[in-house]
Amino acid sequence: MSGRKSGLERSRSVVVIAGEDRNDRESLKILLEEQQPGLRGGIVQIRDPVRLHKATGANLSKRVRTIVNKAQGVAEKQGEGTRVACLYVHEDLDGVDGNVYLETRQRVEQEIRRQLGCGHYVLAVAEMEAWMLLFPDALSAVVKAWKVPAKYRGKDTGRFQDPKRILMREVSGTKGRRYTESDAPEVFRAVIDGGYHRSPLGSNRSWSHFYQDVELCGRQHLHG
């Protein structure tokens, strides 16, 4: 079969995802594949949990080096000469948006890029569940009874202290199926399948930063 191949095929490269757990990694994978359809089949994951946002100095450097080494290792397993086109490292800040978020995101991402050259630190505020609250219709598509109360709609969800509690106690309630962290990939699949990602109801700076990073990665790392 002849014809021009995609950037990933030509350069024998993969995108690597690291995160706190499997649910977060799978959620990120779903979102990345929507933004960059050429990545389907070209994403691999690191299973080790991520603990970066509180690290500084030599400790941060050491932890990032461990992730970078593992990323390069899983890339090599895809075939001789395969390189890491880009690394996405996800972690929840477990705190609301503010100066700490900006400083932490910058500090960790700079270290990732210093060691690898092409990487993005996906630091969710306050956690990835805050992203889900931007898409009430997607949550209802997963479980019809799940409803986001009006007081949480159209807001900056990065300012919510405990989005997970909101989902567990107020969105899914006490009757029927209750939200758990294992529902995250299904929720984000509903976000994509319903096209809700194009018009979030409210705002979240970390969500916007993530999509800006994906667009930048597509231009600079995957199709350069």
Map each language-model feature to its residues:
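C-terminal accessory helical subdomains adjacent to catalytic cores in phosphodiester-
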Residues: 2-14, 23-54, 58, 65-224
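Short hydrophobic beta-strand that contains or immediately precedes a catalytic carboxylate
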Residues: 17-19
